[in-house]
Every structure is written in C-alpha cells, then in structure tokens.
C-alpha cells in the first residue's frame, strides 16, 4: 500500500487534483498481516493539515463545546480565514468544507478514480485526497465498481462517491451544531440547508469537468444529459474510461 500511495498520490498531484503527498516510507523491520504476511513500513504524508471529519467527531464525542470551538477556530484560521469575516463563521466554515469536497469528488469522478474507503477519517477538512489504500483508476467503465475487498455491499462504489461525501459532510455538520446556533432546532435548519445543497454543487463541478473532457466549449442545458448518455454508452459497451475520452480528443485533433 505504501508504494501504491506514493505512485497514485503523485499521479493525482500531476493531474491537478488536491492530494496529500508522500515524503518518505521507512521500513520497520517487522511484519504486518493483511491478506498475507507483509513487510511493515511507516509512511510520512505531507498535507495542508491532517484535520479530518473524524477529528471533529472525536472531539464532539467528548461533549466539550469549548474544545470543539478551539478545534473549529484552528481549522478556520488554517484553511478558511475568510470565514471569520462572516456573521456566522462556523456555518460558513461548513459551507466552505462542503464546497471543497464537492469539487474534489467531482475531480475524482472526472478521471475515473475510486477512493475505496471514504469513511469520515479519510475526508480532510482541507479538501485534499488522503489515504490511498484499496484505490484505483478505472479501466473498463463500470459505475458500480469497487476496489476494497471488504466493501461487499458497494457502499464506496464509483457511483456512490458523491453520496458518501454528502453523508460525511452531514456528520461534520452534526459536530458543529452547538457553534452554529445556541438553539439546536435553528442550528439543524441552517446546517441542513448546506448539506442538502451538496448534490447541486457537486453536479456543477462535475459537469464543468465533463464539458472539458468532451470538448464542449459552450454551455447548453442539454450538456448534462449528453454527458450522462455518453457514460451509459461506454458502460454498456464495456469500454475503457480514459481511452474513450482520448478517442474523442484524437478525432477532434484530426479535424
């Protein structure tokens, strides 16, 4: 996994997709047991920060609102300073993290990347891809494809990635409720609006990327249905995801 993380994180960086990167991998001299006995190693990651949705869940589990405020203030100061200028910085923080994740997952979908294990501990507050375990770039396009051997129900399948991301954002929202509004019901209403807007935000980012891949230079209302139909065709015919777009590019170049 360490070698895979180094290679794929560098590929993601070269593709312009926000990602952690690998600084070093050091052998421990011990064995670890996965599918088989493997040599142990420690990977050092470089990132804007290692704050994750899971970090907020851990603090929330302590029931200490002052500690949660310190964590949220630190995260805002480190990643989203503009949020402090908003009358409700914690709601704005949630909005910015949601937007950053919608953009990130749209980029994954545009290049056929399957993360594999999108739990809350693998969603960064900064919006960088992290933890390249059972991940891969698809060859033959299959929207239901999974790459984790334990994902027998397809929770983290390619097509489910936007929905899991939204679910993770909802978990982040839960941890921020005491900071968003002293009245719990008002806080829920405000946070829910942002969580529910995730899908539309994702769709906008995804379609922008698909227009670029399909060579669509002008925006038309039917572009989304065209992009979806294209994916349905290559899935039905079991075509390679990346090469199908490359063929379009080559045809345009010939013209």
Language-model features: where?
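Catalytic activation segment of kinase domains across protein kinase-like and atypical kinase folds
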Residues: 31, 37-40, 110-115, 119-178
